[in-house]
Every structure is written in structure tokens, then in C-alpha cells.
């Protein structure tokens, strides 16, 4: 009899824990913002279109932006990469792959009730770039600018290989690796990020 009570109590505790974990995961998923659309790459002989997704877990705080700016002033792009590596604001996915961590997502008011998102991520440098010392290995940052209207629709640009420099002490200059920036089209946002 005591054994049955123990098993019943254990089952009740497991159900309570499972329910709590489920609701915590569900509320975390609801506090994300999803931005989906199409990326159109214009390069070489053909134009290529693929799916684009940005999952925003949190926006980069003004303190973190100051930290990135200080790192760029102190040691250039290498120091900026070090500072970015400690940040995780979301995920950038192109096509059907897993994607890469969006290290910084900076949100600013734009237009009439819209939002401008600036996204920085550490791009994966391919083996052949390192092996053969290609110039592209100096362009280790991915960069995107997304403009969303008040209804969560918009467009933007993405530079998959960029170099970041500081001009006049406080202006960031983003240089692409000699290719046209890709266009982000038909973007739609869903979900909300809590402010605070």
C-alpha cells in the first residue's frame, strides 16, 4: 500500500514538473520575435532567392552597444569580434540550415511607428579561406539592416561578409567584401520582445 502511494506521489510530482517546464518553455517562445522573408542575392551570373529568418530573443541594450563601441575604439575589428562573441541576441538563418548566432540586434525607432533593426553576427570563415589566405578572411562579420513598418512588414539588406571600422570616434563604417549586398524582401514579423 505504501508503495502505491509513493508511486502515485512520484507521478503527481512528475506531472507538476512537466507542466511547469512546458509553460516556461511556451512563455519563452512567446517572448521571441520571428522575422521571415526572402533573401535575393545578386552576384555572379545569376540571381538566387532563398528563405531568410531572424529569431530575436532580446535586443542589445544601450550598455552593450557602448561596450561594442568601446571595443571597436580600443582594438578595432578584432576587439569587436571578441566583444561580440560573448553576446547572443538571436539567430540568423539563410536557407534551410541551422543558421548562426545573431550576436547583436540593435533596435531603433524608424519612420512613423516603425523599427529599424541592425544585426551583427560572426560569420563562419571557411577552411579554404584560411588555408589559402584569401582576402575574405578579413571580413569576419555579417551585417543586416532591416526596416519594419508599424505592421511588422518591411525589407532590408544583408552583407554576408563585412569589415567594421570606426570613423570620427563614434560612427561605424561597414565595408562589404566587394559584392552587392543581398536584398531582404517580403519581411514579416510576428511575436513581441518584452521591453525592459
Outline where the language-model segments fall.
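Sec/Tat signal peptide C-region and signal peptidase I cleavage site
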Residues: 21-29
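Intrinsically disordered, low-complexity segments enriched in glycine/proline and serine/threonine
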Residues: 6-8, 29
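Long, low-hydrophobicity ectodomains and other hydrophilic envelope-associated domains
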Residues: 30-196
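Bacterial N-terminal signal peptides
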Residues: 9-20
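N-terminal secretory signal peptides that target proteins for export/translocation
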Residues: 1-4
